[in-house]
Design a protein with these regions (language model features):
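Short glycine-/aliphatic-rich beta-strand segments at the starts of folded cytosolic domains
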Residues: 1-21
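Short beta-strand segments
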Residues: 6-8, 35, 78
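Histidine-centered active-site/metal-ligand motif
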Residues: 9, 38, 57
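Short amphipathic beta-strand starts and helix->beta connectors
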Residues: 23-31
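Short beta-strand
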Residues: 31-37
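Amphipathic alpha-helical segments at domain termini/boundaries
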Residues: 36, 50-52
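A generic structural motif
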Residues: 39-46
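Glycine/serine-rich phosphate-binding loop and adjoining beta1-alpha1 elements at the start
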Residues: 45, 52-115
Length: 115
């Protein structure tokens, strides 16, 4: 099952997020994507099914709904960069590919169809 760990600007300071990033652990044999922005550090990891909660969270992040400034656009590029880095350096599961491809498509669609 694909899971995620997350901390963000709403509940931690920058120093706490930096410390969290340094101490993040997961099994090296797991499929994983590390998303780090100014306001959040998230690790998506695992194989298999994607629970609705995980997909919903990443989709909200991709749409800018979880950003300090709602609708912020830079997060879309940051998600793509994290995904592409993981794709180049790790063996990603089919579920992880689908999750991130879907998030990028949804983020793009929301930005093109809303004001």
């Amino acid at each position: 099952m694909i899971q995620y760990k997350s901390i963000n600007h709403q509940d931690t300071s920058l120093a706490e997020r930096e410390e969290y990033f340094k101490n993040l652990e997961h099994k090296d044999d797991d499929s994983a994507v590390l998303l780090q922005t100014c306001n959040r550090v998230e690790l998506y990891y695992g194989n298999g099914d994607v629970p609705d909660e995980v997909a919903r969270h990443l989709f909200r992040v991709a749409c800018g709904l979880e950003s300090a400034i709602i609708g912020e656009q830079a997060v879309q590029g940051q998600i793509k960069e994290a995904y592409m880095t993981a794709k180049r350096t790790k063996k990603l599961s089919a579920g992880m590919h689908k999750l991130f491809e879907s998030a990028l498509q949804i983020g793009k669609r929301v930005r093109s169809e809303t004001q």
